[in-house]
Amino acid sequence: MKKNIIVGQSGGPTAVINASLYGVIKAGLERPEEIGSVYGMVNGIEGFMQDRYMNLSAKLNEEELEILKQTPAAYLGSCRYKLPEDLSDPFYPVIFQKLEQLQIGYFFYIGGNDSMDTVSKLSRYAAANGSEIRFIGIPKTIDNDLIHTDHTPGYGSAAKYVAATVREIALDASVYQQKAVTIVELMGRHAGWLTAASVLARKEVGDNPLLVYLPEADFDLEQFALDVKAALDQQPNVVVCVSEGISDKDGTFICEYGSAAQTDSFGHKMLTGSGKVLEAFIRNRYGVKVRSVELNVSQRCSGMVVSMTDIEEAAEAGRAGVAAALKGSTGQMIAFRRKDGETYELECVTEDVNLICNQEKKFPTEWITKNGTDIGPEFWDYALPLIRGEAKRKMKDGLPVYLYRK
C-alpha cells in the first residue's frame, strides 16, 4: 500500500530552504509506485497540530516548482515550537493519530538544531510505540552550526551575501579621507561562521574589513579600543565586523552592556545591539565618525545574491532524505561529507539525529589568528567553494519572480 509524505519547515528561513522542499517534492513525485501524495505542513508542527496542511503534489505544477527552488524564505511558513521532553505527554498520541489519518509513511522536517530535536523526539516515540512512520531531518541554517556535517544548506548563500555586502560597504567607506569607523554586526549567537565570511570581501591582503571578531574568542573592550586605534593609524577608513554574540571573558554578551537580552521559546537569548554598543564606545573614546550597520534578516532572505552551489546542494539534501526514508532509514539527518581532493565534491550521507540535536558546531579556534582579530587561510579553502555559482532566475519588470503561498 502506498504511503504519503509530509514535509515541514521550521526555525529561521534561508535563501535556499525552499530548494530542499523542492527536492523532497520532486523525489516524491518521481516515485509514484511508492508515494501517494506529498503534503506540506503550514507553519511546521505547530500548524499541523491545528490541522493546517496542503497537498503540494496536487497544488504545484512544474513551472511553479522551478520558481519555488529559487524562492527565499519558507514557502510553507515556519514556527518555533518546542516538543515536550516527556515522551509520555499527550501531545504525541495526538500528532501520531493525525499522521495516521493522512496515511503518512515518511516525515521530513527541514530545519536547524531545534528542528533536529523535533525529529529526534518523534522518531524515538515512533520506535517505542511500534509506529512504522520514518522520520528524517533535512539540515538548514545560515549559522552553519550543526555537527556531523561539513556545512549546512543556507550557509553558502548567506556567506556570499555577507561577503558581497561587506565589500560594498568597504567601498562606500573608502570615499572620504576623514577618519571613520564602520561596524557591521552579523548574525551568530555562539558560532562565528557568518562573521568569518566577511573576510571573503577582501580583494587583497590589507583590505577591509581590518578587524573581525567572533564569539569563539573572548572580547575585551579595552583591547578593542587599541585595535581600532592601530587600524585608524594604518588607514583613515576602518570596517569592523562583529558577531551579534560576542562576549567577554565572563560570558556576558557585549549587547547586554547596553540592555538585558530577552529569550525565545527554546531559551536562547535574542541578541542584537552589539554594534550599537561598540559604536557608542568608540565615538566616546576617540571622537571620530562611527556608524554601525546591522545586516539582520537580509543575511537569510536575500534571493538575489545566492550561491548556485548552495541551491543545488539544498535540493540534493531533500532528494537524499526521500531516498534514505524509502530505504528504511529513520531518526536520521542528511549530512554533507566533503571528499578529499583538490576539486570540491561532496556526498550526502545519513547521521544519527540523536547525536546532532542540541549540539553546536563552533568555528574552529585554530582558524582564528592569535590576536583574535582575523581569520586564517584555512577558512578561505573551506568557504570559497560554497559561495560559487550564480543562479539564473526568472525576472519580471526588473524584479525577481518568487512563489507565494495562497
At which residue positions do the language-model features occur?
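N-terminal phosphate-binding or glycine-rich loops at protein starts, especially the Walker A/P-loop
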Residues: 1-53
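Short glycine/serine/threonine-rich phosphate/pyrophosphate-binding segments
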Residues: 14-24, 48-49, 84, 92-93, ...
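Short, ordered loop/turn segments at secondary-structure junctions
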Residues: 10-12, 41-46, 80-81, 112-113, ...
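Glycine-rich oxoanion-binding loops at beta->alpha junctions
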Residues: 51-105, 114, 153-155, 167
